[in-house]
């Protein structure tokens, strides 16, 4: 069982230090502390356990240290920044493990960029040694990259020539979309296993800054302070992220039917102010929902249908949204909305079918209504008294999907009708407005939902994953959707091809002294 909750005192691979407005995240991987047996994390390589710590450390910076305005990511190893994902771990892993691992690392890198874009937290990658594969992809997520010019240090994306796979954590996409590396040079770079040294890396726009070893530490410190000047994070008292209570988000797994109920609770009484506490309802909700999604993804692979339910009073949930809107400029509100945004985005790209179920006790209001719009279908009981759906301003911009669109807009494929905001919408009216898939009465509701569930879980999980990913994101694309929809999709295909994972595939024979044997047919 994989757990995604951890604390800094339990870290094995990252060191977190603070100096005024600058935090330093130092990667110093413990070779013998991999998450699974059978491999050593040599050369500052990482596995899922390393990235779970990074995910936690980033949230500690966001919530416990509002005084931090810039973050330096560097290495504690001599001449080695990071060699990327551990190759032997990948070779030993199942296809599902590799896919889930890459998705989580992608989301963590996207989260770095999200914090820079929305929260004013700036990131500087300080490459103080060789940087390869996923190590460079981690640097690519930062706002700026500095590299030491010591005649040894290189940057590379060697996956294609060495392993027969892709740099699957955004590397191919970011060098052209974000770094604006010329396409032919990107082609050369991605097929050159040895990579390039500092001067050429700067010339090709692979890095931003170059400094000699004697000046590197001083340069990094100065540049981190300069980046901090660009931030509007206010400082002040932070919020200690205490252990999760798992009170607001309840998960009930039914392995026999391959379904899971995720029930999200509105507060019994909405908070009246912004409380600097991990128990503050919006923050507690975001943390618990994020953990529940990750737990289901990684520990319940055959549970293919998530039933999204809510409980509570809509009026209390509306008060929560009003509080978030009123105090939108407060640092804790901004960070909490950010965590909710990233968590809901995690829901969007989960390879599970999702049905929203509006029964008599439902509370799909405001922020909680986002769950209904994230679902592939929604079933709403038409009864008196019965459930309602209530929209707030939050549904029209607070929680954009990874493509920048709102879920309401995606639901209507960009053609959003005039919708009531702030007032309860009955099942019949929701059906008329096209807000829900179906609104059966109390005689047919349970039967219709049951049949829909049984039908869904009988279909090919592979076909459903591809179908859902294609239908959920309408309209415009951006770098993030190209990472998930193109790079990741191709990587997942390559991960099951014999040229990578067959008996003589490049990923399988890496490090054995044998040469890969390819099927030369282009598909």
Region locations from a protein language model:
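C-terminal alpha-helix plus adjacent terminal tail
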Residues: 1-69, 75-83, 89, 97-99, ...
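Glycine-rich beta-to-alpha active-site loop
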Residues: 76-77, 81, 112-163, 189, ...
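Helix-rich "cap/lid" substructures immediately adjacent to catalytic or cofactor-binding pockets
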Residues: 108-109
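Hydrophobic/aromatic ligand-binding patch that stacks against planar heteroaromatic rings
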Residues: 137-138, 174-175, 188, 371, ...
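Conserved phosphoryl-transfer motifs of two-component systems
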Residues: 146, 208-209, 437-438
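Membrane-embedded alpha-helical core segments of multi-pass
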Residues: 159, 166-170, 180-183, 194, ...
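Hydrophobic, secondary-structure "cap" segments at the distal end of domains
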Residues: 170-185, 404-418
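Catalytic binding pocket for nucleotide-activated donors in carbohydrate/polymer assembly enzymes
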Residues: 381-398, 402-412, 424-443
